[in-house]
Structures are given as C-alpha cells and as structure tokens.
Amino acid sequence: MPFTKSCRSANTLRKGIKNGKLILKIIVNDIDNVESCLSGDESNDSKKSSASFYMKLKYGSYRALADNILSTDENRKEDIAVFDVPLPNGLQIDTFTLCLYRKSKWKKQIVGEAYIGIQALLLSTNPDETCKYPVISPPSGRNKENQSPSHQICNLSLKWIIYDPEDADADSKTLAKAWLQQIKMNQTSIDPMSNISKSLKELEVDNVESDLEDSSFIAEPDSSIPPSESSVSISTDTGKETPPSKSKKSSNQPYVSIGEGNSDLLGFVFLEIISVSNLPPLKNVFRTGFDMDPFVITAFSKNIFRTKWLRHNLNPVYNEKFLFEVGAFESNYDLVFKVVDHDKMSLNDSIAVGSFNVQSIINSSAQVDPETGLYSFNIETSSPSQDTSSKAEDSPTVQKIADDFSSAVGKDLRTDIIEQIIPLTLCCKHDFSTPRDVKLSFKAMFFPIAALRQKFWRVMLAQYGDIEDGHIGKLGMYAVLDTLGSNIPNSMVDDIYTELSSKNHDDTSDSITVDEAVICLERLVDLVCHQDQQATQTPQSPSSNEESGPGTPTQTSDQYEDSEDSRNFPSKLYLVYLSNCPLCLKFKLSKVNQQKATVHLATCASHDWKRVDRLMMTSYVSLNQAQRRWFSKAFAKVVYGSSKVGSTSATTLVQNRQTGQIQEEKMNAYVRIGIRLLYRGIRNRRIEGSKVKKILRSLTLKQGMKYDSPISVKEIKPFIRFFDLNMNEVDMPVGGFKTFNEFFYRKLKPGSRPCAFPDNPDILVSPADSRIVAYECIEKATTYWIKGTEFTVERLLGYSNEAQRFVGGSICISRLAPQDYHRFHSPVNGCIGPITKIEGQYYTVNPMAIRSYLDVFGENVRVLIPIDSNEFGKVMLVAVGAMMVGSTVLTVDEGKIVQRSDELGYFKFGGSTVITLFEPNVTSFDEDLLRNSKTKIETLVKMGERIGQKIDPNKPTDAEDHSKSDS
C-alpha cells in the first residue's frame, strides 16, 4: 500500500494545516504502458521482479513520497499514490513535479517526470475528474554532447480534490475558485515593474551589465513556499509543458556577508594590525639558530581573522586591515590577538596571546546629535557639478556611488582613530635569562551603523535628489524612493515635508535642507521597521492599522486613514523593494525585513574593497581551528565531523559570555571518538540495548569507586594541567584533598561567584558554572536542541502530578563539563518542596547524545527539586546524572528557605546537567542566550550570573542590559 513518509512532508503538511491553508489532494489512479517502464536495462526476469517503483512529488521545498506504486499483479488497487500538498497564499511556483523512480537491490534510477501546472489543472478539469499527463524520460548520457533527447515513455492518470481542514463540508470546486481568485488578486496587488527597473537598467558595473539590466532585481510577491531551483517553460506551439532547465549559478561575483542577519547592529570596527615586536628567538630543530615565522590570529565573537606569515622575523610588520561587525550584545566583548609560529612540517606553535576590550574603540566613535538624531560630518555631500540634462544622459553608476560613499565615510565622519600598543603574554615554553616584553601594535576605528546609513542617504540624495543650493525638493525625494523600489505613497512624504518645512522655515516651500531630507528618510526607516516588528508580535489583517502610542513611528501612517487616497495605500509599506542587492548582486533583499534590508544596503555600499584585505573568514570558527595545519583540519573533519557552529559533531563549540570568543571544549581524543561512534555511528541504535546499558552502569559505578579511593589523589595534578584550571579560586590547597572526588566537587572561596543583583529577587541567576541553552517554550527546545523522539515534560518529571504545570513553559539546560565547578545552586528565592529521586540509565549528556533520537534526559538517573518562589511561582530543578557520574549528593533538605546562589548539592566525577523548568509566561531569558540557543550553540556562564528576569505584565522586559550589569 502506498504511503507518505512522516518526515519533512508531514511536518510541512502539519504546518500548513495549522496556518489555515487549503490542501490539494493529488490522487494518481494509473500509469499506463507499465511494460515499457519494466523493460529497463536489466534483461533478467529475476531482476525485473525484484525491482520496485516509488513516486516522489516535488513542489518548491515540499517533498512527499509514495512507495511500491507499481506492480504486475492484476489485483492491485486503483489509486496507486495519494499526495496532500498545502497550497500557498501567494503563488510563486505554479508547477509541481511527479517523479517516477525504479529501485532495485543495488541501485535506483529515475524513470521519468511529469510536470503539472496547478492553475491549469484547476481551470481545465473538475474535482474527481481524471486527466492524463505524459511522463518524460530524463536525458541519458553524462556529456551534454552525447546526451539523447528526452522522450515520452508513458502516461499517468490523476485527479484532484481541494479540502479545507477547518471546514470539512466545503465544496472542492468552490474552494478552487476562491483560491484562484485570491492568487489573481495577490499577483496584481503589487506591480513588479516599478520605477526601480528603469533606474537599474541604467546602472553599469564592470562585467555585470547584463545581470543588472535583468528584471530579476524586482522582488516577486510574497509566498509561503521558497522559490524552486528550476523553472518550467511551456511551449507555445504545442501547448505542452516542457521539463525545467537548471539555472546556472553566477560565478566570480563578490559576496558581501556583512550585515546580513544581524538587525541589532551597532556598527563596524575597522582594524589594522601593524606589527609585533620582540618575539622570542625559539631554537630550530638542529639548535643552530632561531626559528620564528609568525602570523597573527584575531578573534572577535564569531569572527576569526588571520594575517599572512612572515619568514624568520622577530619583529614582523603586517599592515593588514580587517573589518567586522559589532552587535548590540557584543559591545563588551574582547578583541583577542594570538601570535602563532608557522611550521612547515609540525603543528603550528602558540607564541603569545593578548586581548583588548572593544568598548574603548566604540567610545571614541562619532557621537549623535541628541536633538536631530544626526551624526556630524566634516564635509557635506554636495550635488554633482553637472546640469540636469547631462545628468539624464549620464546616469550615476552603482560603482560610483559605492566609491564616493566608502571614501566619504573615512574622510567625513568625525571618528577618532585609536592607536594602541598592547602587551602580549607568552604561552610557549622558553628559557631566557631576561624576560621578553612582546607587544602588538594596531589601529582601530568604529563606524556606527546609523551614521553609515545617514551617509548612504546623503550620497543617494546627491546622486538622484537634484540638490539645488543645499535644498532638495519633493521630486528629488520621489526619485530617491523610486530608485530603492519603495511603495511609500507620495502623500506620506508630502506631509513629512510640510512638517519639517513649517518647523524650520517661515515660508511654505516645497524644498527642505539635506539634513532635513536625511531626517525624512530616517523617519521612513523607523516606520517600516516598526511595521515589521508589529507584524511579528501581533498578527493582524493587512488592512488594519496598528495602534501606537504617542511618538511612535506609526503615528505617521495613522494620520492617513481618513485621507482621500487611503484606499490606494498598499497593505504593506516597503522602503527598499529589491530582489537582490545591486552592489554585491548576491544578498536576497526580498527575503529579509526592511530593517535588515536598509542595514545591508548601507553597509554594502560603505565598504571600500581596496582598503580592506578581508571581511570575514568563514572557514574558521575558533582560534584553535585557525591555528591548525591543513592535514590537522582534514583529520578532524574525517574523525570528528563538521566543525561549523551548530553542527552535531565531536567538536563541541561554546561561546564564552564574558569575552565573546568561540571556544572548543577541551576533551581527550579517545573520548570524542568514542562518544561519536557510540551515539552518532552507523549502528547507534544498539545503544538502547540492555547489554550497553549494563556496561555503562557498571563502568560508572566502578569509576566512582575508583575516584573515592585515596590512590586517586595522583590524578589531581594531571587533571589540573590538562584543563588549565584556576586554583586561586579553590578554598583548599591541592595537597589538602584526600581523594580525587573531593577535589572534583571542590568548594570555592567566598566571593568567587557573586550573585548578580543581590537586592533584586526578580533577576534569575545561573545555577552552576555551565554551558547554557535556554528557550522561551519547551516546544522550541525540542525543535532546536533536544532531539529525543520520546522526550516529554511528563517523562522528564517521572509522570508526576506537577508535570502539567510546566507544559508550554520555559526551559534552561545547564550542562556541566568535567572541568567545571560541580556544585549547583538555587537560581531563585523560595522554599524547597518534596524531593524525588528517579533511577535510570547513565548516558552521556554531551550535545551529540542530546541531539540524537535517544531521550537522554528522560532515561538518565535524576533528582527532582521543586522550589516554590514568590517571584517565579513553581520552579522545578532537575539534576540529571550522566556517564561516569558516581552520584548526586544534596546538601539541602525539604522545607528549607533558600536564597539565590545558595548551594543545593553537588555531582561526583563526570559530566552532568541541571535542567530548570518554569511555568508559562513567568520568565524571560536574556537575548544573547536565546540567540545562541537558536543557532544551536551553548553559552559559557558562571554560577550567579544573570540569565533572565521575571516577566512583569505592567512594564516591558529589558533583557539587553545584562552584559553591562554583569561587568
């Protein structure tokens, strides 16, 4: 019997039903001329009989599969395949493909494809009416010159039905007419050929004239289904649909990755590494002289840069320039510099390391005028020295705008250049009679994103605005907006002009100054950005206007409700309505909101490619990876897996919250490989077997007994050296521990982990030194992080009566690595409730296991500690044991009143996890934790640090000041 796989197709179908979309049911009745399909390459009858056929439906990114659809049995059922396809609200792809495959024991191959147009199908046939479509064979042959042409091999018969999941009694024909009418209205609501196409056809960039003249820069109407990789053309002479032709990828085009996804962008830092002085003369292999071929690795947050290496030099001079972005939550991060010695044969050696806080660079940047909101520029951008006629003949090019802009930013913006010489700490083994004073010299500037955007407006006004005597008229502003593809009505611009001219002028002139024109464009930016924010927070009908308080940007649009032309207003306002960025030709402006679109245009135009050597090294994700040789990276790729941020591999990446650096979690190589083979291997299903469970339990208990023995004291010093632990925080000297376990759950000195905001009980603090992922609701945690197929809140809490209180609530997962301080504390003020211990297994809590099909949290041994808090309600803290964790010891009793950061217990040797559950709508986590969690990367925090706060319904939450408050 045919079936549809419950994978991506089922998820897409479920999502479509949830969003209230209509469902198109495609029923394939028959495929005639089956014998021709069966007469493939194999001539052996046994091979023919062993082959099976399946059919796949492709529609955009939607996929559905029906298996075992063809059979030589005469008693097979009439309907051989049934597919349910959610119809989009806006039609961007009109054709879906039915692919017929043949699968044998050793291989599978495509038999043919049928291309069905949705609108043509619904218009030409009635529901439950059978129609036939040809199945076209794909071209055979690897080389294009030797390929045989496609030909028809058989026909398939199908019929269709449209149904509404919310209205079972609705008629299919009525629903089809309503959907076609809606598609027609959506296609005509926004004119794709706006004035921007005329402007773009006049632009000329070297080697890309044909790409710019294409109308593909005009954004298509919004659609809930992503664009397909292929397109279907219809022959005009035969009226039949032809197979899609694969579009060629554009090559050798510059790609700008700056400013793509970070809408909360503070600005950019322009960094120039000048030189390094007084490096140590390390001996070469033959001890005949020194060997030093240094290069510098610079890291900021998730950006890694690397200079060239200079041969045999103790005072290298680089003069290499870099540019990186600074987000709103990265203003207190450190710039980390690492000097590395390049070796031809062996591994590269670390020489020295240092850091510099980026806040010092930000403080020296240009300051905004508090009254006007504008940044000061030394030279105002003037209009070109040519008349109107010559301007019409010689239209300014995109390259000229970019050159003028990038040069003007460096000259005009009043930003101080910081020149710093910082000391570096040697991290190599050396034996010198006199200490080496290694120093690094660099220059840095910070450009606020708002200043770049305002400078971009000035350049656009100068090129397109027709500035006369320092003033710009309404027609000039209309031209600028048309160039950007904006659909903002002229009446809205007229009212802003009237308001600005009445404030600063006595007459009622139709022109304003350039500064006022920049203010006008900034208001429009606030308008469209506020519109996007409201759309994401409260869904509403397109025609309804959003309520806004006094002084909000939407106040500009509300005053047009009663105007005469309000009926002509578009349902959504666009300041930038382009498909691709006309500068880098790569970034899809139509796929992002208006704030990100304006940020990208301003930053893309501001970059002077001649002054910047590199923008972003996407191949590096950490300092250690940038230091490795090619063969080390190749070995790690094969053995450990991908090292990208968010990937499920043996290389665990975490972001240090204090410095912002991406760090590789230190772990023995055999442990990495063992966990990867055990939980991510080919036969990882055997991990659920009783034998494996017994082995893990036995090893855990034996390891706990071993480290409780006095002989285990000898393991303490190698453990400290391997993980480079800071023993100055420990309350007891190393010689005072009698066993390794005593050292493992060591206490720290008082004051080593201060509680954030000690007088504010509404602040949520971290329960342990750990790597944290936090989600606003548990459903998001199962989407991004917890991949256990059987994970539920009820199973995690042992099916207790309290489980229903936390369904739909918030969750914080704090993972403790072996090198962490292994005592856990209370994150809130409250009273300890009845404690429950649940026996279970001893699986590892490494992210590789958590993000597998195995329900680690629901299977492992754990302790439930409820806390009744006046601020956060019922809070459930779950202490989860793990592989090699001997036991979980509690130091608190039931009924005890605890304050934030009070100790609750500790784990013996091994990794472990503390899960904190909150009731719905009680807690809001800090934004940096939520962002990292959505990108599947853990954040390294210390016990007592702020991680969130109580939701106050009377005032908005403020999760953006945690970094300043913690520092």
From Swiss-Prot:
Residues 250-373 form the C2 domain. The modification Pyruvic acid (Ser) is found at residue 912. Ca(2+) binds at residues 343, 346, 349. The C2 domains have an essential, but non-catalytic function. They may facilitate interactions with other proteins and are required for lipid transport function. It is found in: Golgi apparatus membrane; Endosome membrane; Cytoplasm. It catalyses: a 1,2-diacyl-sn-glycero-3-phospho-L-serine + H(+) = a 1,2-diacyl-sn-glycero-3-phosphoethanolamine + CO2. Its EC number is 4.1.1.65. Keywords: Calcium, Cytoplasm, Decarboxylase, Endosome, Golgi apparatus, Lipid biosynthesis, Lipid metabolism, Lyase, Membrane, Metal-binding, Phospholipid biosynthesis, Phospholipid metabolism, Pyruvate, Zymogen. Catalyzes the formation of phosphatidylethanolamine (PtdEtn) from phosphatidylserine (PtdSer). Plays a central role in phospholipid metabolism and in the interorganelle trafficking of phosphatidylserine. Together with psd1 and psd2, responsible for the majority of phosphatidylethanolamine synthesis. HAMAP family: PS_decarb_PSD_B_type2. SUPFAM superfamilies: C2 domain (Calcium/lipid-binding domain, CaLB). GO terms for cellular component: cell division site; cytosol; endosome membrane; fungal-type vacuole membrane; Golgi membrane; Golgi stack. GO terms for biological process: phosphatidylcholine biosynthetic process; phosphatidylethanolamine biosynthetic process; protein autoprocessing. Pathway: Phospholipid metabolism; phosphatidylethanolamine biosynthesis; phosphatidylethanolamine from CDP-diacylglycerol: step 2/2. The active site is at residues 769, 825, 912. Is synthesized initially as an inactive proenzyme. Formation of the active enzyme involves a self-maturation process in which the active site pyruvoyl group is generated from an internal serine residue via an autocatalytic post-translational modification. Two non-identical subunits are generated from the proenzyme in this reaction, and the pyruvate is formed at the N-terminus of the alpha chain, which is derived from the carboxyl end of the proenzyme. The gene is psd3. GO terms for molecular function: metal ion binding; phosphatidylserine decarboxylase activity; phospholipid binding. It comes from Schizosaccharomyces pombe (strain 972 / ATCC 24843). Its cofactor is pyruvate; Ca(2+). Binds 1 pyruvoyl group covalently per subunit. Residues 220-237, 532-544 have a biased composition (Low complexity). This is Phosphatidylserine decarboxylase proenzyme 3. Pfam families: C2 (PF00168), PS_Dcarbxylase (PF02666). The record marks 911-912 as: Cleavage (non-hydrolytic). Heterodimer of a large membrane-associated beta subunit and a small pyruvoyl-containing alpha subunit. It is a peripheral membrane protein.
